Amino acid sequence: MYSCTSPSGIKVSLSTPEIWEEFYPKTEMIVTRNRGRVIFPHLDYIIKGLDPGSLYSIYIHLERVDGIKYKFDAGEWKEFAKGDPILPIQYKEHPRGKRTGAEWMSEPVSFAHIKITNNPEIKDQKVILVQSMHKHIPVVTVKQVRHYKTGYQEDFSGEQFRLEATEFMVVTAYQNEILKNLKVHHNKFASGFRSNGKRRLSSDSENSENSPPKRSKLVTPPTISPQIDLPQQTPYYFNQNFVAPQNYQPQFASAQNYNFEVQNNAQLAWNMYYQKQYEFWWQQQQMMMPGQPQELKNEFQSL
Protein backbone atom coordinates (compact mmCIF):
# COMPACT_ATOMS: atom_id res chain seq x y z
CA MET A 1 0.00 0.00 0.00
CA TYR A 2 2.80 2.43 0.90
CA SER A 3 5.58 0.74 -1.08
CA CYS A 4 5.99 -1.40 -4.17
CA THR A 5 8.85 -3.60 -5.41
CA SER A 6 9.34 -4.59 -9.05
CA PRO A 7 10.60 -8.00 -10.27
CA SER A 8 14.01 -6.43 -10.93
CA GLY A 9 14.32 -5.37 -7.29
CA ILE A 10 13.56 -1.65 -7.59
CA LYS A 11 11.55 -0.45 -4.60
CA VAL A 12 9.44 2.73 -4.52
CA SER A 13 7.88 3.87 -1.25
CA LEU A 14 6.29 7.02 0.13
CA SER A 15 8.53 9.48 1.91
CA THR A 16 5.73 10.46 4.34
CA PRO A 17 3.51 7.36 4.70
CA GLU A 18 2.21 8.51 8.08
CA ILE A 19 0.50 11.52 6.48
CA TRP A 20 -1.03 9.56 3.60
CA GLU A 21 -2.28 6.99 6.10
CA GLU A 22 -4.44 9.66 7.76
CA PHE A 23 -6.14 10.52 4.46
CA TYR A 24 -6.56 7.09 2.91
CA PRO A 25 -9.00 5.83 1.66
CA LYS A 26 -11.06 9.04 1.52
CA THR A 27 -8.48 11.33 -0.03
CA GLU A 28 -9.87 14.20 -2.10
CA MET A 29 -7.96 16.60 -4.32
CA ILE A 30 -9.49 19.93 -5.30
CA VAL A 31 -9.13 20.81 -8.96
CA THR A 32 -9.18 24.29 -10.50
CA ARG A 33 -9.57 25.58 -14.03
CA ASN A 34 -7.12 28.46 -13.91
CA ARG A 35 -3.50 27.68 -13.02
CA GLY A 36 -4.01 24.24 -11.55
CA ARG A 37 -3.86 22.99 -7.96
CA VAL A 38 -0.84 21.39 -6.32
CA ILE A 39 -1.47 17.87 -5.03
CA PHE A 40 -1.40 17.64 -1.24
CA PRO A 41 -0.13 15.57 0.50
CA HIS A 42 2.84 15.95 -1.83
CA LEU A 43 4.01 13.07 -3.97
CA ASP A 44 7.44 12.45 -2.43
CA TYR A 45 9.03 9.04 -2.98
CA ILE A 46 12.03 7.06 -1.78
CA ILE A 47 13.57 4.86 -4.47
CA LYS A 48 15.94 1.98 -3.74
CA GLY A 49 17.40 -0.93 -5.70
CA LEU A 50 18.80 1.06 -8.63
CA ASP A 51 22.20 0.36 -10.14
CA PRO A 52 24.32 3.15 -8.61
CA GLY A 53 26.39 3.65 -11.76
CA SER A 54 23.60 3.50 -14.35
CA LEU A 55 21.54 6.43 -15.58
CA TYR A 56 17.79 6.62 -14.97
CA SER A 57 14.91 8.91 -15.88
CA ILE A 58 11.87 9.09 -13.59
CA TYR A 59 8.38 10.06 -14.70
CA ILE A 60 4.98 10.47 -13.10
CA HIS A 61 1.49 10.39 -14.55
CA LEU A 62 -2.07 10.07 -13.28
CA GLU A 63 -4.45 7.41 -14.46
CA ARG A 64 -8.07 6.56 -13.76
CA VAL A 65 -8.59 3.75 -11.27
CA ASP A 66 -11.84 2.57 -12.85
CA GLY A 67 -14.57 3.47 -15.33
CA ILE A 68 -16.99 4.85 -12.73
CA LYS A 69 -18.21 8.35 -11.98
CA TYR A 70 -18.91 8.92 -8.29
CA LYS A 71 -21.04 11.17 -6.11
CA PHE A 72 -20.83 12.03 -2.42
CA ASP A 73 -24.04 11.04 -0.67
CA ALA A 74 -24.90 10.52 3.00
CA GLY A 75 -21.29 11.01 4.07
CA GLU A 76 -19.68 8.58 1.65
CA TRP A 77 -18.69 8.15 -1.98
CA LYS A 78 -21.07 6.06 -4.07
CA GLU A 79 -21.15 4.93 -7.67
CA PHE A 80 -23.21 7.39 -9.69
CA ALA A 81 -22.87 6.66 -13.40
CA LYS A 82 -20.62 5.35 -16.11
CA GLY A 83 -17.37 7.24 -16.17
CA ASP A 84 -16.43 9.81 -18.77
CA PRO A 85 -14.14 8.73 -21.63
CA ILE A 86 -10.62 8.11 -20.33
CA LEU A 87 -8.11 10.81 -21.22
CA PRO A 88 -4.72 10.17 -22.84
CA ILE A 89 -1.85 9.70 -20.38
CA GLN A 90 0.36 12.72 -19.75
CA TYR A 91 3.85 11.67 -18.64
CA LYS A 92 5.76 14.31 -16.68
CA GLU A 93 9.51 13.81 -16.39
CA HIS A 94 11.18 14.79 -13.13
CA PRO A 95 12.92 18.16 -13.61
CA ARG A 96 16.29 16.70 -12.56
CA GLY A 97 16.37 14.79 -15.84
CA LYS A 98 18.77 11.87 -16.25
CA ARG A 99 20.69 10.99 -13.09
CA THR A 100 22.66 8.04 -11.81
CA GLY A 101 21.01 5.51 -9.57
CA ALA A 102 23.22 6.70 -6.71
CA GLU A 103 21.90 10.25 -7.09
CA TRP A 104 18.25 9.18 -7.20
CA MET A 105 18.67 7.01 -4.11
CA SER A 106 20.51 9.66 -2.09
CA GLU A 107 17.39 11.71 -1.29
CA PRO A 108 13.59 11.64 -1.73
CA VAL A 109 12.31 12.13 -5.27
CA SER A 110 9.71 14.87 -5.05
CA PHE A 111 6.90 15.68 -7.47
CA ALA A 112 5.53 18.42 -5.22
CA HIS A 113 5.47 20.79 -8.19
CA ILE A 114 2.86 18.76 -10.09
CA LYS A 115 -0.58 20.38 -10.34
CA ILE A 116 -3.96 19.15 -11.54
CA THR A 117 -6.71 20.89 -13.50
CA ASN A 118 -9.95 20.03 -15.27
CA ASN A 119 -9.33 22.66 -17.94
CA PRO A 120 -8.03 21.06 -21.18
CA GLU A 121 -6.89 24.47 -22.47
CA ILE A 122 -4.03 24.73 -19.94
CA LYS A 123 -0.76 23.68 -21.57
CA ASP A 124 1.65 23.87 -18.65
CA GLN A 125 4.36 21.23 -18.26
CA LYS A 126 3.63 21.08 -14.53
CA VAL A 127 -0.13 20.56 -14.93
CA ILE A 128 -1.94 17.26 -15.53
CA LEU A 129 -5.50 17.12 -16.83
CA VAL A 130 -7.91 15.11 -14.66
CA GLN A 131 -11.67 14.51 -14.50
CA SER A 132 -13.89 15.66 -11.66
CA MET A 133 -15.77 13.05 -9.63
CA HIS A 134 -13.47 10.27 -10.87
CA LYS A 135 -10.88 8.32 -8.89
CA HIS A 136 -7.23 8.68 -9.93
CA ILE A 137 -3.90 7.19 -8.87
CA PRO A 138 -0.36 8.54 -9.38
CA VAL A 139 2.00 6.21 -11.25
CA VAL A 140 5.80 6.43 -11.03
CA THR A 141 7.77 5.14 -14.01
CA VAL A 142 11.50 4.38 -13.75
CA LYS A 143 13.37 4.07 -17.05
CA GLN A 144 16.99 3.03 -17.32
CA VAL A 145 19.01 5.07 -19.80
CA ARG A 146 21.50 3.04 -21.83
CA HIS A 147 24.50 4.42 -23.65
CA TYR A 148 25.00 3.44 -27.28
CA LYS A 149 27.38 4.66 -29.94
CA THR A 150 24.58 6.80 -31.36
CA GLY A 151 23.78 8.35 -27.97
CA TYR A 152 21.60 7.66 -24.94
CA GLN A 153 18.42 5.62 -25.21
CA GLU A 154 15.76 5.05 -22.53
CA ASP A 155 14.13 1.68 -22.02
CA PHE A 156 10.90 1.67 -24.02
CA SER A 157 8.44 0.98 -21.21
CA GLY A 158 10.42 1.09 -17.98
CA GLU A 159 8.96 -0.15 -14.70
CA GLN A 160 5.82 1.34 -13.20
CA PHE A 161 4.84 1.65 -9.54
CA ARG A 162 1.34 2.29 -8.18
CA LEU A 163 0.87 2.88 -4.46
CA GLU A 164 -2.71 2.27 -3.40
CA ALA A 165 -2.48 4.75 -0.51
CA THR A 166 -2.13 7.63 -2.97
CA GLU A 167 -5.48 7.11 -4.71
CA PHE A 168 -7.68 10.19 -4.60
CA MET A 169 -11.03 11.51 -5.77
CA VAL A 170 -10.99 14.66 -7.91
CA VAL A 171 -13.44 17.28 -6.62
CA THR A 172 -14.18 20.95 -7.16
CA ALA A 173 -14.90 21.45 -3.44
CA TYR A 174 -14.16 19.27 -0.43
CA GLN A 175 -17.04 16.91 0.30
CA ASN A 176 -15.73 15.22 3.44
CA GLU A 177 -15.60 17.51 6.48
CA ILE A 178 -13.07 15.32 8.30
CA LEU A 179 -10.75 15.31 5.31
CA LYS A 180 -11.06 19.07 4.95
CA ASN A 181 -9.95 19.53 8.55
CA LEU A 182 -6.99 17.22 7.93
CA LYS A 183 -5.93 19.34 4.97
CA VAL A 184 -6.00 22.47 7.11
CA HIS A 185 -4.13 20.73 9.93
CA HIS A 186 -1.25 19.49 7.77
CA ASN A 187 -1.09 22.39 5.33
CA LYS A 188 -1.37 25.88 6.84
CA PHE A 189 -2.07 27.33 3.40
CA ALA A 190 -4.80 24.83 2.48
CA SER A 191 -8.26 26.04 1.52
CA GLY A 192 -10.56 25.49 4.45
CA PHE A 193 -12.33 27.11 7.36
CA ARG A 194 -11.24 28.31 10.74
CA SER A 195 -12.74 26.91 13.87
CA ASN A 196 -15.15 29.87 14.02
CA GLY A 197 -16.60 28.90 10.64
CA LYS A 198 -15.17 31.86 8.74
CA ARG A 199 -13.34 31.45 5.47
CA ARG A 200 -9.55 31.55 5.71
CA LEU A 201 -8.07 34.72 4.30
CA SER A 202 -4.59 33.38 3.57
CA SER A 203 -3.57 32.32 0.10
CA ASP A 204 -3.73 28.66 -0.81
CA SER A 205 -0.38 27.07 -1.58
CA GLU A 206 -2.21 24.16 -3.15
CA ASN A 207 -3.44 26.55 -5.81
CA SER A 208 -0.06 27.89 -6.80
CA GLU A 209 2.77 26.85 -4.55
CA ASN A 210 5.56 28.65 -6.41
CA SER A 211 3.53 31.43 -7.96
CA PRO A 212 4.31 35.07 -7.11
CA PRO A 213 2.09 36.68 -4.46
CA LYS A 214 -1.15 38.13 -5.69
CA ARG A 215 -1.35 41.88 -6.02
CA SER A 216 -3.60 43.73 -3.66
CA LYS A 217 -6.93 44.84 -5.07
CA LEU A 218 -6.45 48.21 -3.36
CA VAL A 219 -5.23 50.79 -5.85
CA THR A 220 -2.85 53.45 -4.57
CA PRO A 221 -3.87 56.86 -5.99
CA PRO A 222 -1.22 58.55 -8.13
CA THR A 223 0.91 61.28 -6.64
CA ILE A 224 -0.42 64.64 -7.87
CA SER A 225 1.83 67.63 -8.32
CA PRO A 226 0.74 70.36 -5.84
CA GLN A 227 0.80 73.12 -8.43
CA ILE A 228 -1.85 71.41 -10.55
CA ASP A 229 -5.48 71.75 -9.51
CA LEU A 230 -7.34 69.05 -11.39
CA PRO A 231 -11.09 69.40 -11.97
CA GLN A 232 -13.42 66.85 -10.42
CA GLN A 233 -15.26 66.23 -13.68
CA THR A 234 -14.33 65.69 -17.29
CA PRO A 235 -13.03 68.74 -19.25
CA TYR A 236 -16.34 69.05 -21.10
CA TYR A 237 -18.49 69.59 -18.00
CA PHE A 238 -16.34 71.06 -15.26
CA ASN A 239 -16.72 74.79 -16.08
CA GLN A 240 -19.92 76.04 -14.44
CA ASN A 241 -19.09 79.76 -14.22
CA PHE A 242 -19.11 80.77 -17.89
CA VAL A 243 -15.38 81.43 -17.83
CA ALA A 244 -13.63 81.16 -21.14
CA PRO A 245 -12.18 77.62 -21.43
CA GLN A 246 -8.88 79.04 -22.69
CA ASN A 247 -8.09 80.08 -19.12
CA TYR A 248 -8.03 76.41 -18.08
CA GLN A 249 -6.04 74.92 -20.92
CA PRO A 250 -2.60 75.18 -19.23
CA GLN A 251 -3.78 72.68 -16.59
CA PHE A 252 -3.78 69.85 -19.08
CA ALA A 253 -1.08 68.23 -21.15
CA SER A 254 -1.29 68.19 -24.88
CA ALA A 255 -1.62 64.85 -26.64
CA GLN A 256 2.09 64.98 -27.48
CA ASN A 257 3.28 65.81 -23.98
CA TYR A 258 4.24 62.52 -22.35
CA ASN A 259 6.07 64.23 -19.46
CA PHE A 260 2.88 65.38 -17.81
CA GLU A 261 3.56 66.05 -14.12
CA VAL A 262 0.68 63.89 -12.89
CA GLN A 263 2.34 60.49 -12.61
CA ASN A 264 0.85 57.66 -14.65
CA ASN A 265 -1.78 60.02 -16.08
CA ALA A 266 -0.26 61.15 -19.36
CA GLN A 267 -3.57 60.16 -20.96
CA LEU A 268 -5.26 63.22 -19.39
CA ALA A 269 -4.96 65.25 -22.59
CA TRP A 270 -7.98 66.99 -24.07
CA ASN A 271 -9.39 65.50 -27.18
CA MET A 272 -9.68 68.34 -29.68
CA TYR A 273 -13.13 67.22 -30.75
CA TYR A 274 -14.55 67.74 -27.26
CA GLN A 275 -12.54 70.95 -26.86
CA LYS A 276 -14.27 72.43 -29.92
CA GLN A 277 -17.62 71.18 -28.70
CA TYR A 278 -17.07 72.82 -25.31
CA GLU A 279 -16.04 76.13 -26.89
CA PHE A 280 -19.24 76.10 -28.93
CA TRP A 281 -21.29 75.46 -25.77
CA TRP A 282 -19.51 78.31 -23.95
CA GLN A 283 -20.19 80.75 -26.82
CA GLN A 284 -23.83 79.71 -26.80
CA GLN A 285 -24.13 80.42 -23.07
CA GLN A 286 -22.41 83.78 -23.42
CA MET A 287 -24.81 84.88 -26.15
CA MET A 288 -27.85 83.76 -24.16
CA MET A 289 -26.83 85.46 -20.90
CA PRO A 290 -28.94 88.43 -19.64
CA GLY A 291 -27.58 91.77 -20.74
CA GLN A 292 -26.37 90.67 -24.14
CA PRO A 293 -27.63 92.75 -27.09
CA GLN A 294 -30.86 91.33 -28.52
CA GLU A 295 -29.39 91.32 -32.05
CA LEU A 296 -26.62 88.91 -30.93
CA LYS A 297 -29.20 86.56 -29.46
CA ASN A 298 -31.27 86.72 -32.63
CA GLU A 299 -28.15 86.13 -34.73
CA PHE A 300 -27.21 83.07 -32.70
CA GLN A 301 -30.74 81.63 -32.74
CA SER A 302 -30.87 81.99 -36.51
CA LEU A 303 -27.81 79.73 -36.98
Swiss-Prot record:
SMART domains: TBOX. InterPro entries: p53-like_TF_DNA-bd_sf, T-box_DNA-bd, T-box_sf, TF_T-box, TF_T-box_CS. It comes from the Eukaryota. Residues 193-225 are annotated as: Disordered. It is found in: Nucleus. Residues 204-213 have a biased composition (Low complexity). Keywords: DNA-binding, Nucleus, Transcription, Transcription regulation. The keyword Phosphoprotein does not apply. SUPFAM superfamilies: p53-like transcription factors. Transmembrane segments: none annotated. This is T-box protein 38. GO terms for biological process: cell fate specification; nematode pharynx development; positive regulation of DNA-templated transcription; regulation of transcription by RNA polymerase II. It comes from Caenorhabditis elegans. CDD domains: T-box.
